[in-house]
């Protein structure tokens, strides 16, 4: 949980974008995410430099000798016009390459069509200065800070997306009691709220008494020290998220990284479509122990592109019915799911509704 001072800093940063002419909440969060990532890369580079110097070893740098001007610690000191030019013409293209670090490469996957929407030099300077003062080196705090930023997404998008309230997400995760050796998926992940909460649930549940510490305002922090045996699985194979909104994918990847999942498996994919089974045959059926979801229930649907395994069981264009059918396909034998659906799924009287309820029984 972040304190009032940090909330005030985030609010001020948000207002700066709005007064600077960027008023779409998703765009604001996306642009802040880009800047946060630029700073995180530089912080990681500085940490690796110090560790290598102390151990008298070498490491593969993110920024080569000819790329030092692209580091946050260098471009943040430029004048407004120069900063905008360097960020727009050099830093952003650099993000779109495949840099040496896993962190840069992972986020770079979602940068192909990314654009710097900040056109006013004064706005960029203000945003950079504010982000430079945020505590991005503090484990729990940086994740909570991003969660607070995401809480500003309160309205539905054009695809029927909206952010599930945090307390609902937490309830659903606690009901399913995911274990650290299991696999967890969200087929319409949005900002990855369910996956992040699963990670936090594991941190809370698998922390010894000695691994809990309390800060000055009484907030408990959980080290997850009892998860060490599962750390490799958690980092590389436990979580899978899918969405077909590229902006959401960027935000989801950043959200996961800030909450301790260094290599988030977040993929651009419409999970109802034919291409899902073609691209990810090992993930598209009988693949997961736990599926958590709040899939979109509005928006357009190309019925011709929906996979036959779904349409064959529930002949409908209603996405809420198709997603439930999909989730049943995704689950392993004995798997479990918590999914938010409209009440019509349980009480509708169409043939598709009845067929789905028979499957659920």
Named regions from a protein language model:
Residues 331-337:
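Short glycine-dipeptide loop
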